């Protein structure tokens, strides 16, 4: 009766798994507040390591749990920086869904690496496309100004962010 009321992905979880997932959510939430500027001259582009935890949750428990970790960890930021939080959630979720889909086909290190490689490309593409909508709202920039930021700032930032999260998650996965 209680299991029927649980959201998708939680029904068959043991209490130990649920506790581990909650700890992953809390860890990601704390790490989401560690924000480091990466691109000189574009201080609003900040890296945070919470995506690492979301990727590990995806590899360990599946895509929907990874999405839950990513979204839940950024809820506090929706109040202070709704556009930045939205962008971070979308970038992380696009990475997670690709990694989870590839890894689920054959759960092994090679598929985790392949999923991360494809996820970096997809996440970067999604982020660049969304930047053409969100950056004008965030900074009052024109389409041309956003386009001029793609190569020197937006593309490197998004690739570095997704790649860093992927590399650390894969190294951590190997230790598990």
Residue ranges with predicted function:
Residues 1-176:
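Loop-helix junctions at membrane interfaces
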């Amino acid at each position: 009766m209680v299991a029927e009321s649980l959201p998708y992905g939680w029904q068959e979880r043991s209490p130990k798994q649920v506790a581990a997932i909650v700890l992953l959510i809390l860890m990601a939430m704390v790490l989401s507040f560690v924000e480091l500027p990466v691109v000189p001259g574009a201080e609003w582009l900040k890296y945070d390591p919470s995506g690492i935890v979301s990727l590990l949750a995806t590899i360990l428990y599946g895509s929907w749990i990874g999405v839950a970790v990513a979204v839940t960890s950024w809820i506090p930021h929706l109040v202070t920086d709704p556009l930045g939080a939205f962008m971070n959630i979308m970038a992380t979720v696009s990475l997670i869904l690709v990694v989870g889909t590839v890894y689920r086909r054959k759960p092994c290190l090679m598929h985790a690496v392949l999923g991360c490689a494809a996820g970096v490309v997809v996440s970067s593409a999604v982020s660049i496309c969304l930047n053409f909508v969100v950056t004008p709202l965030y900074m009052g920039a024109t389409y041309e100004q956003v386009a001029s930021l793609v190569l020197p700032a937006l593309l490197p930032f998004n690739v570095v962010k997704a790649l860093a999260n992927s590399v650390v998650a894969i190294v951590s996965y190997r230790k598990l």
